[in-house]
Every structure is written in C-alpha cells, then in structure tokens.
Amino acid sequence: MMKRSEKAKELFLKGYNCSQAVLGAFCDVIGFEFDQAMRLASSFGGGVARMRHICGTCSAMFMIAGLMRGYTVHEAKAKSEHYAFIQSMAKEFEARNGSLICRELLDSRAKLSKTVDNGSGPEANERTTEYYRARPCLSIIEDAVILTCKMLSIPNEIDA
C-alpha cells in the first residue's frame, strides 16, 4: 500500500505534468485506464498548456469531483449544488496555497533561478534537479490529492 499523494508525486517526478500526476493517482476510483487519464489531463499542466492560468492540480481535482458527483441532467438545482461543491474545493485550495493561479503559485512560492524558465510558451522544460528544486509543484500536488481525498471521502491509501 502507498499513499495517493505519494503516487501523485512519483508520477510528477517521472515527467507527467501536475494535472496528470493528480488525476493518475485516482484512476482506481474514477474508473479510468491510466493512459486514458493521462490523455485527458495532458492539456492542463502548467496552468493549461503552460499558459500559467488555473493550476493543473485544481483542474484535476475538479475533473475527479465531476466524475464522482457531477450532474448529468440539465437541472438548475443539480448544477447549482455541483458548482457550490466545486467552489468550496477551490476556496479550500486557495486558503491552503494562496491562489488557484499557476503563475501566482510559482511567483509567490518558488525560488526560481535564472536557469529555470518560468515562461508561458508551449516548450516544455527539461526535468532536472534544478527544475524540481525551483518549484513548489510537489507540495501543491500532494496538497491537492489530500484535499481531494478529504472532500470526496476517498482513502489516501492505494494499492501500489
């Protein structure tokens, strides 16, 4: 057994983006094959395609919540209840991390060096020791998984 939060960090360290790392740690509960989850989350890393908008971990949290308790019938009450739940997840994430925005999370919490590109172009950074050292992403990934487990009543333990 291992913790989902550790699984997510392991995925990030293997080169998956932040959104893929979080979503990949929940494949067993959302009913997705790993490759399917990786494709779905592939667009959301780096704050949506590295544009530094909403944090990819948040996108993954909201996808998991939608798959587990989202609405399917176009009914105002169900939609409102779901949106209220997602907003509560977002508010909790923001309270714990200071922002939902990738750029703000990187700027306020990272110790970026001149050798690490924090830009918003489409070119992916090489994953180096400096890349991981300069970013708060691992702790944010861990927190997003723990928050998702808490708010959706999912155990943090997973079969490895």
Positions of the model-derived regions?
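C-terminal binding/interaction regions
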Residues: I86-A160
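RNase III-family endoribonuclease catalytic core
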Residues: R52, A78, F93-E94
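Structural signal for hydrophobic packing residues in well-ordered secondary-structure cores
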Residues: F12-G15, F26, I30, V48, ...
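Glycine/serine-rich anion-binding loops at beta->alpha junctions
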Residues: Y16, F44-M63
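Phosphate-handling active-site elements
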Residues: V29-R39, A65-S88, N156
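Acidic-glycine-rich active-site phosphate/pyrophosphate-binding loop
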Residues: A25-S43, T115-G121
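Polybasic, low-complexity association/targeting segments
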Residues: M1-K14
